[in-house]
Amino acid sequence: MPTTFHEIPRKRPTTPLLDRAQTPDGLRRLGEAELETLADELRLELLYTVGQTGGHFGAGLGVIELTIALHYVFDTPDDRLVWDVGHQAYPHKILTGRREQMASLRQKDGLAAFPRRSESEYDTFGVGHSSTSISAALGMAIAARLQNSERKAIAVIGDGALTAGMAFEALNHAPEVDANMLVILNDNDMSISRNVGGLSNYLAKILSSRTYASMREGSKKVLSRLPGAWEIARRTEEYAKGMLVPGTLFEELGWNYIGPIDGHDLPTLIATLRNMRDLKGPQFLHVVTKKGKGFAPAEVDPIGYHAITKLEPLDAPAAAPKKAGGPKYSGVFGEWLCDMAAADPRLVGITPAMKEGSDLVAFSERFPLRYFDVAIAEQHAVTLAAGMACEGAKPVVAIYSTFLQRGYDQLIHDVAVQNLDVLFAIDRAGLVGEDGPTHAGSFDLSYLRCIPGMLVMTPSDENELRMMLSTGHLYNGPAAVRYPRGTGPNAPIDKSLEPIEIGKGVIRRQGRQVALLVFGVQLAEALQVAEKLDATVVDMRFVKPLDEALVREIASSHELLVTIEENAIMGGAGGAVSEYLARENILKPILHLGLPDAYVEHAKPAQMLAECGLDEAGIEASVRQRLALLGLA
């Protein structure tokens, strides 16, 4: 097994057992004694695959044995296996007939980064966001009962995803309907358990066995006839188990808790799953795994090896130096956050488990008492910020656009209705690339601009981002700044913390006939197009409040208005312009460019923008086509 990053195989390894186990049917034809070797081969294959394509890395390495055991014991796809989030699903894809397609992973027209129902019958539920698996599996279990089917429903959820309220809502509901389902907690952070070893594994086998289950149910029937006896016995059992296993919470919710067991011990996994397969009612199995298992660098640094980029062949020529680009937008935010926190002691930073991705590491180290990572709990993050704002704090919620969708009710009910001073720093706005539609920030302008009192800003470069963050921080009420993944155009940055005038756009180029009204980072492309068309370019900056005076001025002096945004056209910033013109009875041809009424599939960001007509060529072609239609070409 490779021990360094550079030892990851560039050529497909020899895997005789995996060659025979390319589907679950083939896997089940292997003997149990062969499965340990299969696990080694699958782990090596995963290293090779992700090295070829890039992608999620550590999570898959941690569930090799669990994935094998699940497909070995259960009759997938008839038994429904639901993976939470999907970061760990690459081994599942390899074992379910997609090994030869893995080279297309996360590429245009290739395999998706996450399980998708349209991709395979083994992908029973599409995922990408966390904490949905238990609810989905519960729905499947109830449907099976209504259909008089004996098929099983299994949810695999990580300890991080289990922190979300949605997961506990499902855990609370399943015992109420006595669902025949299995939840597997993949605990790869030791965040819940410490009792892992021989005793726990032994207990798991005993507690999950049919004999134990039969004795338990028989005792319940006998003792239920004696007043108070069953309750005493139940409490005695609970206390005895509680001394050895950490499952009291799940037992209290009504689950039959088994574990924790070693998630890399295949014989124990298989024996326990076989026992639990035929048990009725809600079953909960706690397995402990190590993220990055089998690859030392990933075991030591699971965060750094959560995902990797594509490896170049060892004999590849030296890559051409990359063009100098600007800093990452998230980095500009992180620096601003520290600067503003030093200047304003009221500032607090909140993130739902995105410290690294949103660049809050430096802030968390410099201002630990003002930094709050609430885990995967977007609803809580928003209302926590609201509560802080009620007491005079100035919260900044750093959150990805796609995840803010999960806290939308709180955004309206708890923040906006009360006009509280909460700034939302919305990262990953627009198209994000290889992770596909589940992670795209396609809708934030649409769902934000309809909220009364909301300040909504779209920077065109790094400097505007910094200025808009200051503007939102000083604003009396809820504010949002949305910015994309990746780097800016290397604009000079004003390090001051001064705001800009609210609701005012800026004309960046004066032209004639055509006016390009840009909301966000497509400004650079618009300026290039404008040089060819002699068009006016307006950096609109604010979606709400819209610079209506500037729109009126531009409409009066141009024959065609073109709005450009990396957001859904429906309900987006362009719609705000059209609504204003209609309200003022201003008749003017207008073309809206943005994201279509469709989910843009995974590809490289440049490919996705081209597909949507938001690259330079696409913008130019659309404008020329409309000019021709209007007889203005």
From Swiss-Prot:
GO MF annotations, alphabetized: 1-deoxy-D-xylulose-5-phosphate synthase activity; magnesium ion binding; thiamine pyrophosphate binding
GO biological process, alphabetically ordered: 1-deoxy-D-xylulose 5-phosphate biosynthetic process; isopentenyl diphosphate biosynthetic process, methylerythritol 4-phosphate pathway; terpenoid biosynthetic process; thiamine biosynthetic process
Cofactor(s) the protein needs: Mg(2+); thiamine diphosphate
Gene Ontology cellular-component annotations: cytosol
Residues annotated as binding Mg(2+): 159, 188
Key word Metal-binding present: yes
The UniProt record lists the keyword Metal-binding: yes
InterPro entries for the chain: Dxylulose-5-P_synthase, THDP-binding, Transketo_C/PFOR_II, Transketolase-like_Pyr-bd, Transketolase_BS, Transketolase_C
Cofactor note (record): Binds 1 Mg(2+) ion per subunit. Binds 1 thiamine pyrophosphate per subunit.
Reactions that this protein is recorded to catalyse: D-glyceraldehyde 3-phosphate + pyruvate + H(+) = 1-deoxy-D-xylulose 5-phosphate + CO2
Source taxon at top rank: Bacteria
Keyword line: Isoprene biosynthesis, Magnesium, Metal-binding, Thiamine biosynthesis, Thiamine pyrophosphate, Transferase
A Pfam family: Transketolase_C
Region Disordered, annotated ranges: 1-22
Signal peptide: none
Binding-site positions, thiamine diphosphate: 87, 128-130, 160-161, 188, 295, 378
Pathway: Metabolic intermediate biosynthesis; 1-deoxy-D-xylulose 5-phosphate biosynthesis; 1-deoxy-D-xylulose 5-phosphate from D-glyceraldehyde 3-phosphate and pyruvate: step 1/1
Family named by the database record: Belongs to the transketolase family. DXPS subfamily.
Subunit note: Homodimer.
HAMAP family per the UniProt record, alphabetical: DXP_synth
NCBIfam families in UniProt: dxs, PRK05444.2-2
Identification of the protein by name: 1-deoxy-D-xylulose-5-phosphate synthase
Gene: dxs
